């Protein structure tokens, strides 16, 4: 037997120097849940259009037609029924929550709160002095509650995919409810199937399934949601212009935003929507995520050191997978080794505090790369 070589042993087990064999590595190492992977073709298309597009006025035809492409493309992708409209504004989803407290919630909202993001809209509604305290239904992290029709509630706030825990929920109108159904689909939109008849407002930001950058919000609004916006705007309720959804509506109808948007973000978004629509629409894009999810969860279930965090298989998200590790393995070390090898952002949601990795499986992420990631994790655990 060869004499014990301390240096060799150290280089084999220190996370900083563990080198994953290149044939195991995914072709693209981006697995972050937002901002997330942007496809090379989107960048190429942006670069090609740059000389006549970037650095030009958002009030002129070139940019406005790109915004029009986004609005029409989303209507097609989500098969929006007659009368639904696509609104967009600056500030991302977090800004939209505040806008919703002014111009979507009339008196009282009900929130399903089952993680960091869904709880944030509930807090925004609770803080707003001009509406009643919301009704909040919570459930354990790793599960989701169910909305129930409630007297006095005029808006039901659902979350398609709770990005902090990796739980997805079906979008259905609560039985017997008369209020609007507003869905935070920031991480779910484009990666999960949805029926537009089941919502009045399906809102998101483009840095997740839509492979663009942050800072913008988009909302698919039913005629009932538009009517609510118009009546609250006419009600005399004081509203800062930035959160005024009537101003947003008027600008969106002209393919503009109230103030200057990031033009690159809109271009990248338009490319992604086009890619989805040209390849078969939402069944194509959500199908890619579903295939990736099947790979990730079946790997974890077969593993003797990893398990899906979400117990109910139906609740396990197709777009953001959360995987727990057994106590003898430190997930932060795995994430660190992966990062040192160019495979990034698999860290769990910071406030969840579990021995876990979180893997984005948005439509842009190739399923073969998810399979490679699983192989890399197996290799790291075997070599630590
Ligand atoms: C990322 C995310 C948000 C926050 O989006 P911002 O654009 O950063 O405000 C909100 N809700 C969900 C479900 C998310 O995944």
What are these regions (language model features)?
Residues 6, 10-57:
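N-terminal "arm"/small-domain region of PLP-dependent enzymes with the aminotransferase-like
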Residues 6-8, 13, 28, 351, ...:
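PLP-dependent enzyme catalytic core of the Aspartate aminotransferase-like
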Residues 37, 207-297:
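Active-site C-terminal subdomain of aminotransferase-like
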Residues 50-99, 116, 120, 124:
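Conserved N-terminal alpha-helix of the aminotransferase class I/II PLP-enzyme fold
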Residues 94-154:
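PLP-dependent aminotransferase-like
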Residues 138-190, 201:
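Active-site phosphate-binding strand-loop segment of PLP-dependent enzymes
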Residues 196-207, 217:
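Conserved active-site segment immediately N-terminal to the catalytic lysine
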Residues 307-337:
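Conserved PLP-binding catalytic core of the aspartate aminotransferase-like
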């Amino acid at each position: 037997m060869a004499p014990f070589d301390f240096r060799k042993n150290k280089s084999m087990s220190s996370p900083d120097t563990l080198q994953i064999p290149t044939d195991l590595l995914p072709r693209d190492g981006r697995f972050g849940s937002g901002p997330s992977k942007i496809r090379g073709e989107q960048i190429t298309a942006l670069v090609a259009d740059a000389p006549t597009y970037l650095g030009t006025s958002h009030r002129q035809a070139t940019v406005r037609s790109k915004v029009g492409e986004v609005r029409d493309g989303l209507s097609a992708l989500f098969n929006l029924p007659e009368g639904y409209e696509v609104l967009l504004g600056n500030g991302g989803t977090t800004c939209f929550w505040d806008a919703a407290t002014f111009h979507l919630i009339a008196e009282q909202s009900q929130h399903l709160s089952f993680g960091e993001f869904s709880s944030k809209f509930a807090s925004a509604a609770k803080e707003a002095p001009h509406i009643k305290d919301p009704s909040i239904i919570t459930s354990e992290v790793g599960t989701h509650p169910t909305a129930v029709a409630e007297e006095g509630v005029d808006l039901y706030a659902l979350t398609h995919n709770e990005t902090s825990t990796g739980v997805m929920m079906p979008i259905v109108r609560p039985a017997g409810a008369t209020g609007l159904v507003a869905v935070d689909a920031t991480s779910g939109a484009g990666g999960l199937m949805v029926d537009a008849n089941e919502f009045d407002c399906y809102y998101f930001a483009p840095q997740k399934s839509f492979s663009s950058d942050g800072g913008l919000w988009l909302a698919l609004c039913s005629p009932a949601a538009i009517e609510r916006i118009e009546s609250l705007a006419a009600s005399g309720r004081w509203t800062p212009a930035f959160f005024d959804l009537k101003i947003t509506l008027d600008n969106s109808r002209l393919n503009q935003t109230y103030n200057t948007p990031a033009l690159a973000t809109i271009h990248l978004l338009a490319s992604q929507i086009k890619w989805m629509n040209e390849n078969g629409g939402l069944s194509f894009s959500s199908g890619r995520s579903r295939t990736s999810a099947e790979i990730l969860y079946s790997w974890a279930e077969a593993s003797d050191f990893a398990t899906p965090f979400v117990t109910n298989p139906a609740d396990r998200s197709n777009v953001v997978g959360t995987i727990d590790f057994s106590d003898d393995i430190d997930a932060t070390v795995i994430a660190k080794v992966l990062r040192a090898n160019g495979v990034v952002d698999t860290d769990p949601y910071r406030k969840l505090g579990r021995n876990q990795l979180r893997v984005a499986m948005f439509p842009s992420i190739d399923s073969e790369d998810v399979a490679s990631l699983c192989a890399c994790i197996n290799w790291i655990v075997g070599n630590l």
